């Protein structure tokens, strides 16, 4: 695994672990279907370095952190809720609400950057007559508008057409 120590920016590489997902029905199904191989489900956990204010602008390991986060299917955010002078904290002291809000804010800002770049691209394409570009631009404007108001992409509501245009965007 990657190094993990008690000081900021010590964890550069991600730590990865895999755990089986128990399924009592798996053997029953195998008995009925007789497959050549039975492969139980598993879940892969990726522990990545934390972030600091300004990560969405590349500060600290921000760009690397956000790239790792974009590659996962789900995010489990673990927040430190204890004070211990022997365990360093990037801001000097643990404040769970502030720390959780920091991550959420950095995600919103990073997503806003993605949405605004896509909006610019599709707006230009719409001016040159590219098919569906106006619809794509409208979808990204919807996202950008919500993010500017502090609403995460996951909390916004989209039409099926908007979802088609947003599908490859890898929002956090």
Which positions does each model-derived feature cover?
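Amphipathic alpha-helical coiled-coil segments with heptad-repeat character
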Residues: 62, 93, 100, 105, ...
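C-terminal-of-GTPase-core extension/linker across diverse P-loop GTPases
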Residues: 118-172
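Conserved G1/Walker A P-loop phosphate-binding module
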Residues: 1-88, 97, 104-106, 115-117, ...
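Short secondary-structure junctions and interdomain/linker hinges
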Residues: 36-39, 110, 114, 147-154
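Alpha-helical scaffold segments in soluble metabolic enzymes
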Residues: 28, 102, 114, 139-142, ...
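Charge-rich, low-complexity amphipathic helices
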Residues: 15-17, 34, 51, 91, ...
